[in-house]
Amino acid sequence: MERDFPGQRIGPEPTTDRFVAVMNGKAEKVTPGNAAAMDSSRPFRALNRFGSGFLSKFEVSQCPSPILKDIYFVDTPGVLSGEKQRIGRSYDFAALIEWFATRADRILLLFDAHKLDISDEFRRSIEMLKGHDDKIRVVLNKSDRVSNQQLMRVYGAMMWSLGKVVRSPEVLRVYISSFWDKPYADVGASNKDLFDKERNDLLADLRSLPRNSAV
């Protein structure tokens, strides 16, 4: 998108428990979940069955962006770990992952290379993607923040962990890069050519999706 979207929150730990549908619009606007689920022009009316506990944690963010003319994104909450998983949700997180996965054309699993963590909640969420293996792409983000040797170890550990959860005969496609508009960190600068190619490959994959696809 090459820009932030309205209501975006970024941090080293999960900074939101909201599902955010990021869609194209002439002006920047955030629509609360209750209103979005009542709008017949949007594909979210079926979300009413998850109740107000979820709808209060769902919103539609609109902004002008060329890529959003063809697809829209659903940004899911950062996964929780430990005790936070048990008390931190007012809705069925895994059931919602399954609902969105059924309707999505592409599913991106994001991992940070400098902080690889597959919590129990993330593992259960991945298990809910069973039957959608062809839609899944893995993104190893912030790969420029680790050395070549560390990157190899992180990649191996990630694929080993995913192999225990994703029961697919096909090899998952993994994109290794740093997916924001900042310069690469010095420690990973030697992989610039690789990171550039991987970033372009991911964008090409998204652009190949049918018009009005969901990610």
Functional labels for PLM-detected ranges:
Residues 128-137, 142-214:
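Canonical P-loop GTPase G-domain recognition
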Residues 11-13, 34-37, 84-89, 112-113, ...:
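Short coil/turn segments at secondary-structure boundaries
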